[in-house]
Amino acid sequence: MSFVHDLQKWKEVEKAFAKYLIDYPDIISIEFPKGKCKDYDVKMTYGNDKTATYEIKTDFKAQDTGNFVIEYRFKWEASWIYASKADYIVQYILGKWWIQKRWELILRIAQVEKRETKWWDWFQSSLYIIKADKLPELFEPLNFNETPNESED
């Protein structure tokens, strides 16, 4: 299963992200395309308001479609999630997973945070889905796994 089939799919991704940039201000920026990068950087700080803020900058390389970069910042209340669990989640997001899994996890974080769902409950329940490689069930809004329509009404 390929992540982004062609440039038309990239256009859909970029258009969809424009909405996320408005709806989810914690997403800092996304750029198309980007230079050849393969690393990520994570910065974690604790605030006086009993929150832990994680900043992730991740450069992904996609076959045949160029590169893109996502910068994402998210914050948890300390009472929601212990630092050890947060660290594990960050490692999971940036671990040795396929590009689409990492991409979808980053987007899903924003969606879950926006809905004020219990983040850790979602993550735990999603581990099985991800390991089972059932990405369409995991990720619904952008429908990456569907072929773009030739025409739109």
Where are these regions (language model features)?
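Residues that flank catalytic or metal-binding motifs in active/ligand-binding sites
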Residues: 38, 50, 85
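Acidic-basic catalytic patches of nuclease active cores, encompassing PD-(D/E)XK
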Residues: 1-36, 60-61
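Beta-rich nucleic-acid/ligand-interaction surfaces
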Residues: 35-43
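Short glycine/proline-enriched coil/turn segments at helix->beta-strand junctions
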Residues: 23-26, 48-51, 93-95
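Conserved catalytic cores of phosphodiester-cleaving nucleases, focusing on short active-site segments
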Residues: 42-62
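Catalytic cores of nucleic-acid endonucleases
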Residues: 4, 29, 57-100
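Non-catalytic C-terminal interaction segments of nucleic acid-processing enzymes
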Residues: 66, 94-153
